[in-house]
Amino acid sequence: MAAKFHLCLLLIILGTITVQGARHPGKPHFFRRQPGSDCASINGRCVPPNERCPNGECHLQSCPGYQEKCCCPV
């Protein structure tokens, strides 16, 4: 009886972890907002220069890292 209970509890925990991972796919870590910048004021995102901007690059020089560019908002 205890083995069935432990197995059931394990399945519930694994199911919860799986659902939590599926619920938060999120954006890649390199997409981030920089509060107070011109890029953030237009809802853009600062990304490393080697990453592709899905909607094109907004040519703003306000990303704090000198090696970052601003991606236009969706």
Swiss-Prot record:
Mind naming one GO cellular-component term on file for this protein? extracellular region
Origin: domain of life? Eukaryota
Q: What is its main location?
A: secreted
UniProt keyword Oxidoreductase present: no
Give the propeptide positions.
22-31
The UniProt keywords, alphabetically, are: Cleavage on pair of basic residues, Disulfide bond, Nematocyst, Neurotoxin, Secreted, Signal, Toxin
Give the function comment from the record.
Induces neurotoxic symptoms on zebrafish. Has also been claimed to be implied in calcification, but tests on homolog proteins suggest that proteins of this family have a neurotoxic function and not a calcification function.
Q: What is this protein called?
A: Small cysteine-rich protein 8
Biological source species = Orbicella faveolata
